Every structure is written in structure tokens, then in C-alpha cells.
Amino acid sequence: MGRRILNDALRTIVNAERRGKASVELKPISTVMSSFLRIMKEKGYIKNFQVYDPHRVGRITVDLQGRVNDCKALTYRQDVRAKEIEKYTERTLPTRQWGYVVITTPDGILDHEEAIKRNVGGQVLGFFY
């Protein structure tokens, strides 16, 4: 049985936020995880993150901002068409005003707003708010 690296990392971030930590270290890492964190940084949910030694097991240090209420990775990949993204976000997120669903698309890993703009669907990786 393999580890769910992205799910473990997101749970670590949420637990550190609840404890009031300023930063957290994530091990092991993956490129999907760094793309997920890049989207969180662009949207202002984390301050910054640094990837150390990406070619080995590596680690990522994340500087927290105190804005993450919850973030989860889906353990199964759910296919979503471009027209169904809006319905999926309404079901998943608590309100329409904050939070993002992260989707892996042919154009790369995007948040739901960017995927709707580009009119591409894909598989849902997770969400944060």
C-alpha cells in the first residue's frame, strides 16, 4: 500500500495552521505537491515555500499565513468536464466567495477559475479554503 503524499502534506499544513505555527516542513515531496503549493501561494493562502533537494527524497518548507481553514486531497481522481466545474465547486466549497478547487488539466495544474477561463476539464486533485 502506497502513501498518499499530497494528502499527508495538506493534513500537515492544516494541523500546523491550527496549532499557530509559522512554518512547516513537508517530507517526502512530489512535483504535484509543489504545483498545488504554487497555486496556494498565488491565491494568498501561504506566504512562500522553498523546495530543498528536489531530485532525492527532498523536503519543502512552507511559510504559513494563517488563512488556511481546511484543505484536502481526493484519494480518488474524479473526472470533471469544463461545464461541470462550477457545479462541482458549489458542492465542495463552503461558499462561492472563497476557496479553490485544484484540477489537473492538459494545460497543467490549475485552479477552477483558470480552468473555466481556458474551458478545459480534467481530474480533481483537491481543494482548499
Swiss-Prot record:
Main location: mitochondrion
SUPFAM superfamilies recorded: Ribosomal protein S8
Cellular component GO terms held in the UniProt record: cytosolic ribosome; cytosolic small ribosomal subunit; mitochondrion; plant-type vacuole
Biological process terms in GO annotation: translation
Sorted UniProt keywords: Mitochondrion, Ribonucleoprotein, Ribosomal protein
Superkingdom assignment: Eukaryota
Subcellular location: Mitochondrion
Recorded family membership: Belongs to the universal ribosomal protein uS8 family.
Subunit structure: Component of the mitochondrial ribosome small subunit.
Family annotation (NCBIfam families): PRK04034.1 (NF003115)
Protein name from the UniProt record: Small ribosomal subunit protein uS8my
Gene: RPS15AE
